[in-house]
Amino acid sequence: MLSRLFRMHGLFVASHPWEVIVGTVTLTICMMSMNMFTGNDKICGWNYECPKFEEDVLSSDIIILTITRCIAILYIYFQFQNLRQLGSKYILGIAGLFTIFSSFVFSTVVIHFLDKELTGLNEALPFFLLLIDLSRASALAKFALSSNSQDEVRENIARGMAILGPTFTLDALVECLVIGVGTMSGVRQLEIMCCFGCMSVLANYFVFMTFFPACVSLVLELSRESREGRPIWQLSHFARVLEEEENKPNPVTQRVKMIMSLGLVLVHAHSRWIADPSPQNSTADNSKVSLGLDENVSKRIEPSVSLWQFYLSKMISMDIEQVITLSLALLLAVKYIFFEQAETESTLSLKNPITSPVVTQKKVPDSCCRREPVVVRNNQKFCSVEEEAGMSQDRKVEVIKPLVAETDSPHRAAFVVGGSSFPDTSLVLETKEPEIELPKEPRPNEECLQILGNAEKGAKFLSDAEIIQLVNAKHIPAYKLETLMETHERGVSIRRQLLSKKLPEPSSLQYLPYRDYNYSLVLGACCENVIGYMPIPVGVVGPLCLDGKEFQVPMATTEGCLVASTNRGCRAICLGGGASSRVLADGMTRGPVVRLPRACDSAEVKAWLETPEGFAVIKEAFDSTSRFARLQKLHISMAGRNLYIRFQSRTGDAMGMNMISKGTEKALSKLHEYFPEMQILAVSGNYCTDKKPAAVNWIEGRGKTVVCEAVIPAKVVREVLKTTTEAMIDVNINKNLVGSAMAGSIGGYNAHAANYVTAIYIACGQDAAQNVGSSNCITLMEASGPPNEDLYISCTMPSIEIGTVGGGTNLLPQQACLQMLGVQGACKDSPGENARQLARIVCGTVMAGELSLMAALAAGHLVKSHMIHNRSKINLQDLEGACTKKAA
């Protein structure tokens, strides 16, 4: 329950960073300004003479205070030094923001408490720095930095708050209670220090729960690079911090802290309210005196300078202890900024040969890899295959990683391209770094697990054999290889090695590529247990003249003649003046099934849903789940006591299955409140209907309902399509209409609509399985024109399930195809327009393909063309199949 509250809080703060940051800063400034305008106007040294203040300055406490300041600075320095070892400049920057703003909030609180007296702030800041803990801030930053997208940043921050929030809250409570005991000691200096300590803990907690997560979310949102596959701040080796098992607090420790807190609360209650209430007032008075606020010993004087000049002079004039403190801070800052990075790299290079000078290579043919041009870096010469000095940052490069190589020279290391243990291309790199080879034999699992869990080392210090050994021992789940390796590609490579040993032919994966692919866009979105990617030829047809525009349409297919035939249809349409299209309806559907005790009860629910009041209730719940989803109508059917409710909603530019499922689930929960006896059997009851032939999609529509038409002049029919209008109409009636009816087809009143739909779907990142419903099409042909020699053709497709955001449309090759059509991503001006435009293009392309295919059938050219263009010229006798090999 507590974790859920912190998760909701974290999600809210991360989703509204500007509001939280502005609100937090405004609240802090208001507290300071309110104190300035309404508080006491006494300022020691400016308009008041404070003898007690002078006495404190001359006391021997200066030495202790100076030592405390130096220790605080050293403590902060070592914390940032540890953070640098993590290898992320974003963690350093975010931790710096946390420190600065926490100090600002703490200073504001102290100034407010001291009634504008800045001398006490000088004493309080060292105690604040000693109590600040950057480990929790960096832990939350790791959660965010391990994300692949901005939406995942918010989810991971919420998850981090759910894990870290309760622990941090309990720790802050315990610290305040423990430190607060010192405020009851009666020792003036101890009371002051403990008071400052409690303020420090509360200021840190306030910033961690409000400003910090909002700042992390905003910084990462502003620093993302949308053109890159993986965000520039994404750290794959931090993925394991997302494992709740590694972050869950020790329950024994938590119980001890709670018992301690309860005991300390009793101590405070007994001391302050039960034992003797008068000492409390006395202590408060003494504290006020100790802070230099006693009005009886202060004399009012006339200010000699303005207030800002007074503060400026105090800042410029420094005592010896301030000079010592400032000198130490500047010295450590210079060391950290200018020297620490070099020391860190030097230290890591002795531990890890991978961190020695890295050479990058652009992917080139194998023949080019034999050249050995020289690249000079850090006054050393290296062999590389890349000669272009001004290579753009946006171009794809691959890091060349060292592998263990047997060589006579201790200063030569073998490098290979890629993550496979069977390299295709190798280079030799001259280096002066001492060679530290990984052991040839795999180390014990315990040692490998320690290296894997070390933030400074990680998986890159383990060989592939050691990773495989950990997977076989169940220490690493095979499905998490990408997230645990230093690169996703290495995880895929290791999975291929694991799989190859289990296949009938170990070399089966030889021709399935896996390198140079952006797997960060695949994980968690498109595919699991990845072993590579499938290259499919992509052809282009066009121009497709549609609605006054010209489109070059990409089609991914392995069927010969398909692209050529569709291209001929596009040419015929363009010569006829182009095609026109309209979107008749736009609404994705989801059809859950619910059950009630009796059929009469189901009838009552159906009747209530069909009333305006019932629909309004369900629509309000449904629409609350998304800014795009808007419930349009409900189509309800009964089967006994089962009730099938078909929700239909617009989903913007997304195909919308996830969006509408979320809204459906919320609507069913609201419906359950009105009918508690209702049982929700499944959020999908096959009444949608998704990826199955269904008359409901053909009749009611699903996704986009599109119609497209064109008139082809008789001359074009004769010269381009090589047939006549009469012959095409005759074939269309007897094949597409009568023939499909004889076969009992549902939505299949076309020649080959599924061919064109599927080819475009694969090229543009759609769900290829949805070609089942999306290919519903009726192709009609009529004679047109004054002499009835022109051909009028139309295609009506009632259920094109398509989108331009989400799923496979996030992959870069698929995005390239969408960009060819000008519909990539979401339409900012009119949400949903890109998806509707893509649906019109699909329908227009289907019509072009239908036109050419029907012409080939009418002219008798189909078999001839396929025998020429759709048969492989490779001598099949030279290829050994699996069965042939076994038989031999």
UniProtKB/Swiss-Prot annotation:
Residues exposed to the Cytoplasmic side: 1-9, 79-89, 150-159, 221-248, 340-888
Pathway listed: Metabolic intermediate biosynthesis; (R)-mevalonate biosynthesis; (R)-mevalonate from acetyl-CoA: step 3/3
Species classification: Eukaryota, Metazoa, Chordata, Craniata, Vertebrata
Compartmental location: Endoplasmic reticulum membrane; Peroxisome membrane
Name of the featured protein: 3-hydroxy-3-methylglutaryl-coenzyme A reductase
GO molecular function: hydroxymethylglutaryl-CoA reductase (NADPH) activity; NADP binding
Source organism (scientific name): Oryctolagus cuniculus (Rabbit)
EC number: 1.1.1.34
Glycosylated residues in this chain: N281, N296
GO CC term, one of those recorded: endoplasmic reticulum
Gene3D superfamilies linked: 3-hydroxy-3-methylglutaryl-coenzyme A Reductase, Chain A, domain 2, HMGR, N-terminal domain, Hydroxymethylglutaryl-CoA reductase, class I/II, NAD/NADP-binding domain
